[in-house]
Amino acid sequence: MTPAQLRAYSAVVRLGSVRAAAAELGLSDAGVSMHVAALRKELDDPLFTRTGAGLAFTPGGLRLASRAVEILGLQQQTAIEVTEAAHGRRLLRIAASSAFAEHAAPGLIELFSSRADDLSVELSVHPTSRFRELICSRAVDIAIGPASESSIGSDGSIFLRPFLKYQIITVVAPNSPLAAGIPMPALLRHQQWMLGPSAGSVDGEIATMLRGLAIPESQQRIFQSDAAALEEVMRVGGATLAIGFAVAKDLAAGRLVHVTGPGLDRAGEWCVATLAPSARQPAVSELVGFISTPRCIQAMIPGSGVGVTRFRPKVHVTLWS
């Protein structure tokens, strides 16, 4: 079995079709089918068959699917460790929700990376629905965001630890019609909602709140950051959903007003997710133990910026209107 064969088969399993796998891998349909055929011949197992409802996998095909993810992950991890050993540096890859990446990751990365001169941190932003896949495939070492056992799974392969509670609140400018009293649902639906990138995640907390409030999509504008959405609210009006501690200073200074009422607040909790302790690298275990300490919590809440020599951001694109 070759990595190319396993990569093609893993993509077919994850995406549910040869065509989708080919598009993701940049191969032709025939190329993916060739890799699958080679695996079928070597293992003497059909692996899957096509049905009217999609692909139906044999027991052996399902076993290969889980093993393929593990093997490819170990291959990638080994390559990283060899490179680290050659250059005398360690790399910690963090996947984070957009809200955590904007509001808490800077302070965390600066403080944690300052503990070791040989450590570089790479941060990428992903929806929490991808956390399990990213961890199991070893595409990242650790994932941080509003994860839960329902989204990550409770089969023991993923370690999950909550570490910081927060509130999502509704805020407006002081001159907004929502600033006084408890607003009626119709008035909420009539407002322009200036939203950060978290609103673009269909299964995220912000999207859930917006659905609960029945805010029409035509009244939602999504910006590249929560800070940009807040700036627009203070400049032209409208409402936004924000992490409570991130807007505490603006609320205290009177630049924003907290709007209360049914569905306008939501409690959340950030969690750290990794492979089981026996399978993760030492730097991950260090971060898991460090992230819930009072010193680290204090660093994450205000956010103190990131030293550019320590932080390697991955390129990602956010679309906004």
From Swiss-Prot:
Domain of life, source organism: Bacteria
Ranges of the DNA-binding region feature: 18-37
Keywords: DNA-binding, Transcription, Transcription regulation
GO terms for MF: DNA-binding transcription factor activity; transcription cis-regulatory region binding
Matches recorded under InterPro entries: LysR_subst-bd (IPR005119), Tscrpt_reg_HTH_LysR (IPR000847), WH-like_DNA-bd_sf (IPR036388), WH_DNA-bd_sf (IPR036390)
SUPFAM superfamilies documented for this protein: Periplasmic binding protein-like II (SSF53850), Winged helix' DNA-binding domain (SSF46785)
GO biological-process terms attached to the record: regulation of DNA-templated transcription
HTH lysR-type domain sequence ranges: 1-58
Coiled coil: none
Membership in a protein family: Belongs to the LysR transcriptional regulatory family.
Protein name: Uncharacterized HTH-type transcriptional regulator Rv0377
Organism: Mycobacterium tuberculosis (strain ATCC 25618 / H37Rv)
